[in-house]
Each structure stands twice: as structure tokens, then as C-alpha cells.
UniProtKB/Swiss-Prot annotation:
Segments forming domain RdRp catalytic: 286-483
Keywords for this protein: Eukaryotic host gene expression shutoff by virus, Eukaryotic host transcription shutoff by virus, Host cytoplasm, Host gene expression shutoff by virus, Host nucleus, Host-virus interaction, Inhibition of host RNA polymerase II by virus, Nucleotide-binding, Nucleotidyltransferase, Phosphoprotein, RNA-directed RNA polymerase, Transferase, Viral RNA replication, Viral transcription
Name under which the protein is recorded: RNA-directed RNA polymerase catalytic subunit
Chain segments carrying region Disordered: 52-82
Subunit record text: Influenza RNA polymerase is composed of three subunits: PB1, PB2 and PA. Interacts (via N-terminus) with PA (via C-terminus). Interacts (via C-terminus) with PB2 (via N-terminus); this interaction is essential for transcription initiation.
Enzyme Commission (EC) number: 2.7.7.48
UniProt xrefs under Pfam families: Flu_PB1
Transmembrane segments: none
GO BP field: DNA-templated transcription; symbiont-mediated suppression of host gene expression; symbiont-mediated suppression of host mRNA transcription via inhibition of RNA polymerase II activity; viral RNA genome replication; viral transcription
Record gene name: PB1
GO cellular component: host cell cytoplasm; host cell nucleus
Cited function: RNA-dependent RNA polymerase which is responsible for replication and transcription of virus RNA segments. The transcription of viral mRNAs occurs by a unique mechanism called cap-snatching. 5' methylated caps of cellular mRNAs are cleaved after 10-13 nucleotides by PA. In turn, these short capped RNAs are used as primers by PB1 for transcription of viral mRNAs. During virus replication, PB1 initiates RNA synthesis and copy vRNA into complementary RNA (cRNA) which in turn serves as a template for the production of more vRNAs.
Localization of this protein: Host nucleus; Host cytoplasm
Location of region: Promoter-binding site: 249-256
């Protein structure tokens, strides 16, 4: 029998059909090659939006800088970055008037955090520009290198372990006449391989000392490295994103802490909360506007889009905001917070890897690094690239481009939200002093504007006034990309609102399926995703049950672990059948060992091992949960792990899942190819660092890693802790006399070895 698909929707309210409009199947696009072109685009565009500003030269670095602040008022609808200082300050004052004490309280909260935050806060985060090696590194390594080099240059405040003291070192480093750094370089040589007798290129890594004068050091400290943003859907062109170095990171963190504290107190802010909490907060604003628009009033909502939010923001404006917000606070606090915007006003954008040229006829490839773009003959480039390079040339110093205006992506999300909310705040009747009024929602560059007025002309006037007010602070609402609707239907940060926020379950589709970490984690993540969607995204019981069955099927095909009594033949079926036959209680076998699936929508919260534990044969239990199993390199056994799940839209989300460590929780070995490259030394450093920290935390479970003062104290601390713990355990009868004696002996041996060294 044929089913007419329209019948499926007869009883469904239209907003529930949103999940059927899902356009994103398949993998998102990734970028390949160099990001240099995209970065030049960003730099050139940013300068174009501020072109009527004043040019100055930075006295320290010699970089030309464009300052659009208090520039000409716009005469057309083109996007521009000419924010007016007095307008921004006035918006801040009104925001404080409507929320008495908000800035004062947030400052006090932040001050407390500033004094308590430890340096290891900066090890969070992914790739970081490492100024010592002039390329990206994992955050922990970049921080370690920075502290190491500071120390060898006599800057040791950070040894206290407080972030604020590390920042003191950063400030002092900028006053130094020169900094001595250690950089890596590689030598290549041709050698004959003993096994294959072929010639191979062997790379060795060397370290060398290098002196940077004040100018070169400042340029590096102010540099943001750029990369191409990956996995962006619905865009034809890629775009560049920035990773700042360690000098900037700490200062940005404190500014964002203050701004986050303010955002938490603003009902129009979509940050820093997320998920259901965010939906509830936003629904309140909509409810307020709809209840207040009595029968006589009209209410319309704009689903807003801003043109190039980051490129029209200005760090100098943020400095003005911070100066105002912290005006009654102690001097040291105001100074710490104003450094981030000052550094951003003097920032340099690193152009990335440069361009790759290849000659088809001669089979030659050559890389033109970004440093050469300043003086290379342009005849080799196509017209488009020629124009870009010509435009950017006046701004280049050492392969980096001076970029004073603009903010780069994702740097001050919270603070720019405060600016956006301050304009929404001006929509109250006591400020508009007319019949129309507005309110709305702001989350970084995304906004929704709700305007109420007695008639259509009033609505139009309200929108126009909002548009023009935004222009005064460097926010450019795009008239082409924003659309207006009767209040009750709009979109904000990929949440669709229609008489309430609609659960758009299809957005989560990419995160269903097998993650490919290992058998244990994948099972746990799979059922957790289904559970979370039942809680948060209106995934109904019947659909969830079906999703579960599809997941189990997918899982069995991925790991070739079909049930022991199946007819399907795979590489593993011989072994699994054997296990099936010799197992007494077959229900106790894990799905990954060819067992049956015992999950249903009621028990998704229980890890599979726990679900089946009572059903398992004893010898199976012993094999499954055996920490001495030689085939498993065990991860740290924690009760909760974090998985990264990819929704269709927006950033990757971190999701917790229960981790029960079994012999199925294996970790694949690292790819060996890295061991032959220049990265090898860094990799070894990093592993050593990791091992030391892990060991230290075993002794002091709650410790956050502090760099010990003087090299010996870390080991000494662990030895003395081991002795104390052993004595307590011995006296309470937890360990035997022989074990106690052995521990004491090991401790003495360690001390002896240290003395000899």
C-alpha cells in the first residue's frame, strides 16, 4: 500500500515539522592548504570598513595603525566601524541606571577570581600560538615554553603559581631591551637505510639560542596566528580565525570573566548560559513583550543579522567600556583589565604559511612564505591575489600584518554581548520618549529585536531608530539579511521560536551513530546521546526506541560483533561463536562480545557493564575487568569522561558519559610518522610533562599543578607524602608490615639517587 506523505503531517502542528527540513547530510567541508589568502581578506576588509579613520605609527614596533574611533558619522547604509566614544559611554551609563549596582558587583566578583586563578587555567584550550617557536602548539606546551623562557630571562614571578603573577612577568618582559629564547631547527641529511638499502632523508632536531630585540619581541607578543575555520556549513568561502599567544591569553581571560559576570545578570543576554536554561531566559523576554503589547499595540520581531560583527568592533571601544565599568575600582584592577584591549589595539596578524607554487611542466613545487610577500615580484600571482598583496603591503612587518581595528573571531564574545545588550536596553519607553519601544536578545553577534508600537509607522520608526543607534557604536545591522515577522515566530542562535521554542531534533542528527573511540566508549556515548535527546529535544519514546535499534545495528557492523548465534560471517565471527558456545549465561556477554542487547529506553542511564554484571559468568567478569590485562593500555580510570559531539550547527559540544573501564577501553597507539619529524622533541617533552603531572596528582589528588620552586621540591613532596600515607595505612591495618617496609625502602632509594645526581 502506498502512503501519501502529506497524511503524516495532518495532525502535526506546523512548527513540529521543522525536523523534516534538515539540509545537512554528509561531511562538512574542510579547508586544505594555506589560510594566507583568507587572512589577507580579513585584514583588508577590516581596514576598508574603517578607511576614513586616522593613521598613526606605533612608536615601539613601527607598525602603521588605523584608528576609526569618533570618525565621520555614516551617511549611507554601508557597514562601518566608526564608533563614537561618548555614545558607547552613555549606553553603558544607561545600562547601569536600569540595573543598579551591576558593574560594581561584577567587579567585586571578578576581583576575587583574579586573585585566586592559577596559571594552569591557561593550559585549557586547544592550539595556541607559541611565540618562542613562531607556530601553533598545544596550550600546555606553549605555556611551559613561555614560563621556561621567562625564567631563563630572570622573570620568576609566575613561580607562585598565580595567573596574576604570570601576567606581571608578561608586563615586565615587554620592558626588557632584549629576550633570549631557545628555538628548534631541523637538519636534514641523506643516509642509507640498513634494512632496505635505499637512501632516506633523516631529520634531526636541534635547539639553538637566539636573541630578540625589544621590537621583535613585542611583535611576537602582540601576534595572533591565523588558521582557516574548518567544518563550516552553508558557506561558499572559507574564513580565517585567530589563535592568540600566551601573553594575550591571560589578560583576555580576566576581561571575559568580568563580562561573563555582567552577562549573567542581564536578562537579554544569550551568553554564558546554553541549552534549556538559555531557552527559558529568552522565552521570558518574549513573554514580557507579548503581555505588554495590549490589544491596541502591534508587536513585531526581527530575526537579526549583523554585517561583519568582529571586523567593525574596535578594541579602543572596549577599552572605553572597561574604563567606565571599573571606574570606582582599585588602580591595579583597572590596569590588569585595560591591558587586553590595549594589546588588541596594537595587534599583528600572522599571515600563515604563505603560498604554494607549482610548475606543471617542470614538476616543481615551491613555497613562498608569508615573510617574502612584502618584496616579491607580483608577476607570479593572479589578478585577485595581486590586488590583495598590494593592498596589504604597507601594513607588513616580518610576515605579520598590523591590524589595529577589528577584533578577530571569538575573542571578546562576552564583552561584545554587553555592548549589544546596552543598545537593546535603550528601547525602554523612558529612553525612547515616544510611542514605540523595543527589547530583544543578544548572543555575541546574533540578535533578535522585538519592537512594539501602536501602528505600522511606529514599528518602522522604532526599527530605524534601533538601526541608527547601533551604527553609533559600530554595530551594523544588515538590512538584506534580517527579516521581520509578527512576534511569535523568529529564529535566534539556531533556536526557532513559534509560540515557544521548537525542538529541532534534526540538528542533533550528526551526533547519532558510532563515534569510533573504542568499543566501551562508543556504546556509552551512543546511548547517552539518545537519552539526552529524549530529555532536551522532544525525542519521543517510539522514535527513541527505533534510534536505539538502529544504533545497536550500526555498532555491530562497525565492530563486527554480531550476536554469537547469527548467520552473518565476519572476521570476528569465528572467535565470537566460540565464546558464545562456551558461555553459560549468554545474556551477560557485552554487545561487543557478541552478546544480546539489553538496552531499552528505560535503562539508558546505566552503563552496559553494570547492566549485565549480575548476568555474567564469573570467569567472564574476571577477564573483562582485569587491570593487568596486557593488551590494554589503560587510560586514567575516571567515572565520567567527556566526548565531543558534533551538532549540525554551531560549535562541537562536550558531552559527559559514564566510563566504566574494561578490557574494551583500549587506546590505539599514536601514529609513528610523527616520531620522525621535528615535532618529536616536543612530543617527548609533552609526554614527560604529562607523566610528571599525573604522578604528582596521584600523590596530591586535589592539586592543581604548580611549578615547584627549585627543581627538587616536587620529588621531595611526593616522597614525604608517600611516607605519611604509608604510615597511616600501616597503623590502620590497611597494609601489611612487609608492604610498609618495602615502601620505606623505595623512598630511601629515591632520595639516595637524588643525592648522587
Amino acid at each position: 500500500m502506498d502512503v501519501n506523505p502529506t497524511l503524516l503531517f495532518l495532525k502535526v502542528p506546523v512548527q513540529n515539522a521543522i525536523s523534516t527540513t534538515f539540509p545537512y547530510t554528509g561531511d562538512p567541508p574542510y579547508s586544505h592548504g594555506t589560510g594566507t589568502g583568507y587572512t589577507m581578506d580579513t585584514v583588508n576588509r577590516t581596514h576598508q570598513y574603517s578607511e576614513k579613520g586616522k593613521w598613526t605609527t606605533n612608536t615601539e614596533t613601527g607598525a602603521p595603525q588605523l584608528n576609526p574611533i569618533d570618525g565621520p558619522l555614516p551617511e549611507d547604509n554601508e557597514p562601518s566601524g566608526y564608533a563614537q566614544t561618548d555614545c558607547v559611554l552613555e549606553a553603558m551609563a544607561f545600562l547601569e541606571e536600569s540595573h543598579p549596582g551591576i558593574f560594581e558587583n561584577s567587579c567585586l566578583e571578578t576581583m576575587e577570581i583574579v586573585q585566586q586563578t592559577r596559571v594552569d587555567k591557561l593550559t585549557q584550550g586547544r592550539q595556541t600560538y607559541d611565540w618562542t617557536l613562531n607556530r601553533n602548539q598545544p596550550a600546555a606546551t606553549a605555556l611551559a615554553n613561555t614560563i621556561e623562557i621567562f625564567r631563563s630571562n630572570g622573570l620568576t614571578a609566575s613561580e607562585s603559581g598565580r595567573l596574576i603573577d604570570f601576567l606581571k612577568d608578561v608586563m615586565e618582559s615587554m620592558d626588557k631591551e632584549e629576550m633570549e629564547i631557545t628555538t628548534h631547527f631541523q637538519r636534514k641529511r641523506r643516509v642509507r637505510d640498513n634494512m632496505t638499502k635505499k637512501m632516506v632523508t633523516q631529520r634531526t632536531i636541534g635547539k639553538k639560542k637566539q636573541r630578540l630585540n625589544k621590537k621583535s619581541y613585542l611583535i611576537r607578543a602582540l601576534t595572533l596566528n591565523t588558521m582557516t575555520k574548518d567544518a563550516e556549513r552553508g558557506k561558499l568561502k572559507r574564513r580565517a580565525i585567530a589563535t592568540p599567544g600566551m601573553q594575550i591569553r591571560g589578560f583576555v581571560y580576566f576581561v571575559e570573566t568580568l563580562a561573563r559576570s555582567i552577562c549573567e545578570k542581564l536578562e537579554q543576554s544569550g551568553l554564558p548560559v546554553g541549552g534549556n536554561e538559555k531557552k527559558a531566559k529568552l522565552a521570558n523576554v518574549v513573554r514580557k513583550m507579548m503581555t505588554n503589547s495590549q490589544d491596541t499595540e502591534l508587536s513585531f520581531t526581527i530575526t537579526g543579522d549583523n554585517t561583519k560583527w568582529n571586523e567593525n568592533q574596535n578594541p579602543r571601544m572596549f577599552l572605553a567600556m572597561i574604563t567606565y565599568i571599573t571606574r570606582n575600582q582599585p588602580e591595579w584592577f583597572r590596569n590588569v583589565l585595560s591591558i587586553a584591549p590595549i594589546m588588541f589595539s596594537n595587534k599583528m596578524a600572522r599571515l600563515g604559511k604563505g603560498y604554494m607554487f607549482e610548475s606543471k611542466s617542470m614538476k616543481l613545487r615551491t613555497q613562498i612564505p608569508a615573510e617574502m610577500l612584502a618584496n616579491i615580484d607580483l608577476k607570479y600571482f593572479n589578478e585577485l591575489t595581486k590586488k590583495k598583496i598590494e593592498k596589504i603591503r604597507p601594513l607588513l612587518i616580518d610576515g605579520t600584518a598590523s591590524l589595529s581595528p577589528g577584533m578577530m573571531m571569538g575573542m571578546f564574545n562576552m564583552l561584545s554581548t554587553v555592548l549589544g545588550v546596552s543598545i537593546l536596553n535603550l528601547g525602554q519607553k523612558r529612553y525612547t520618549k515616544t510611542t514605540y519601544w523595543w527589547d530583544g536578545l543578544q548572543s555575541s553577534d546574533d540578535f533578535a529585536l522585538i519592537v512594539n508600537a501602536p501602528n505600522h509607522e511606529g514599528i518602522q520608526a522604532g526599527v530605524d531608530r534601533f538601526y541608527r543607534t547601533c551604527k553609533l557604536v559600530g554595530i551594523n545591522m544588515s538590512k538584506k539579511k534580517s527579516y521581520i515577522n509578527r512576534t511569535g515566530t523568529f529564529e535566534f542562535t539556531s533556536f526557532f521560536y513559534r509560540y515557544g521554542f521548537v525542538a529541532n531534533f534534526s540538528m542533533e542528527l550528526p551526533s547519532f551513530g558510532v563515534s569510533g573511540i573504542n568499543e566501551s566508549a562508543d556504546m556509552s556515548i551512543g546511548v547517552t546521546v539518545i537519552k539526552n535527546n529524549m530529555i532536551n529535544n522532544d525525542l519521543g519514546p517510539a522514535t527513541a526506541q527505533m534510534a536505539l535499534q538502529l544504533f545497536i545495528k550500526d555498532y555491530r557492523y562497525t565492530y563486527r560483533c554480531h550476536r554469537g548465534d547469527t548467520q552473518i560471517q565476519t572476521r570476528r565471527s569465528f572467535e565470537l561463536k566460540k565464546l558464545w558456545e562456551q558461555t553459560r549465561s549468554k545474556a551477560g556477554l557485552l554487545v561487543s562480545d557478541g552478546g544480546p542487547n539489553l538496552y531499552n529506553i528505560r535503562n539508558l542511564h546505566i552503563p552496559e557493564v553494570c547492566l549485565k554484571w549480575e548476568l555474567m559468568d564469573e570467569d567472564y567478569q574476571g577477564r573483562l575487568c582485569n587491570p593487568l590485562n596486557p593488551f590494554v593500555s589503560h587510560k586514567e580510570i575516571e567515572s565520567v569522561n567527556n566526548a565531543v559531539v558534533m551538532p549540525a550547527h554551531g560549535p562541537a559540544k562536550s558531552m559527559e558519559y559514564d566510563a566504566v573501564a574494561t578490557t574494551h577501553s583500549w587506546i590505539p597507539k599514536r601514529n609513528r610518522s610523527i616520531l620522525n619529524t621535528s615535532q618529536r622533541g616536543i612530543l617527548e617533552d609533552e609526554q614527560m610533562y604529562q607523566k610528571c603531572c599525573n604522578l604528582f596528582e596521584k600523590f596530591f589528588p586535589s592539586s592543581s599543578y604548580r611549578r615547584p620552586v627549585g627543581i627538587s621540591s616536587m620529588v621531595e613532596a611526593m616522597v614525604s607524602r608517600a611516607r605519611i600515607d604509608a604510615r597511616i595505612d600501616f597503623e590502620s591495618g590497611r597494609i601489611k608490615k612487609e608492604e610498609f617496609a618495602e615502601i620505606m625502602k623505595i623512598c630511601s632509594t629515591i632520595e639516595e639517587l637524588r643525592r648522587q645526581k
